[in-house]
Structure formats: C-alpha cells, structure tokens
C-alpha cells in the first residue's frame, strides 16, 4: 500500500535523472516529483515528505536556494535533504551541507548507495520525530501534574 510507504520528494529539472531515481526507489517508497525549485517548495509544504532528494543545478531557483528555503520554513525545516548532483567537487558539497543538507551524493549514482543513504536518513528523521512527540507528551503530562499539585497546595 503506497500510503504506508515513506514519502520522497525528488527535485530535478532533468527527466532522465528523475527516471533513474524513480526506478531505484519506486518499489520501496511513495514518490513525488518537482521539476523546479518553486514547485518543490509548494509540494514539500503540502505533502511533508520524509526526505527530499534535490538537484543542485536548476534554472531560476537552484538547489542551494531550495534547501535554504526549506530550512527557513517552520513546516519543512526538519525534513532531511540529500543533494543528488553532478557537481562532485568538494566546494559544492560543502555549500550543500552548509545550506542544511544531511548528505550529498554525486552523479552518476550507485543505486545501492542511494537506497542505503535514503533509508538511514529517513530512519533518523522518523526517530527524531517520534522522540520529539514523546517528549512533548511528557511535558504536557508534567504540566498537568504541576497544575494539579498547585491546586492541591491551595487547600493546605
């Protein structure tokens, strides 16, 4: 069932690159595709994917700008971003990581490496979300207990 699968947003302006990543990931994940930075931001805000695979070189809005915009938005800031790009030099890798990406994969891709990295980053993201929700629930329980204790002290 596709609704039970983790969601990946693939962002690339080249149909061939989208096809390659889709072929590698379609069996295990629910995929969405954006062919521009603006479209990627719209889809990410609505669908809240579990990870974004982002090309660095795109017209109008490049991958760095998309990543920075995702990280600046409260609803998308925690979604992990992996750059998947032909820009394989260290300077661009550093730019991508500085923009907020969790990983950087150079093209041509190795399907097993892409699958492994996507899997581990989604697991980390979901674990973080689970722990944040658990902590939030415990904070609420503590607040309730504190209010109850304070109300009891009024009667003492």
What are the roles of these predicted feature ranges?
Residues 91, 108-118, 122:
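C-terminal output helix
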Residues 47-53:
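Active-site beta3 strand of CheY-like receiver
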Residues 58, 96:
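Receiver (REC) domain active-site loop signature in two-component systems and cognate sites
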Residues 18, 59-60, 77, 89, ...:
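The feature encodes the CheY-like receiver
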Residues 3, 15-33, 46:
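Two-component/phosphorelay signaling modules centered on CheY-like receiver
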């Amino acid at each position: 069932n596709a609704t039970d699968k983790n969601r990946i947003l693939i962002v690339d302006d080249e149909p061939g690159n989208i096809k390659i990543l889709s072929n590698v990931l379609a069996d295990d994940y629910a995929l969405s595709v954006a062919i521009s930075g603006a479209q990627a931001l719209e889809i990410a805000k609505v669908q809240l994917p579990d990870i974004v695979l982002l090309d660095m070189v795109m017209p109008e809005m490049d991958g760095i700008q998309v990543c920075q915009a995702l990280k600046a938005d409260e609803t998308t800031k925690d979604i992990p971003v992996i750059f998947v790009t032909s820009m394989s030099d260290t300077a661009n890798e550093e730019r991508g990581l500085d923009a907020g990406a969790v990983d950087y994969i150079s093209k041509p891709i190795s399907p097993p490496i892409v699958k492994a990295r996507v899997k581990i980053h989604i697991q980390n993201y979901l674990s973080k979300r689970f722990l944040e929700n658990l902590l939030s629930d415990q904070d609420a329980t503590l607040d309730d207990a504190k209010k109850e204790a304070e109300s009891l002290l009024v009667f003492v």
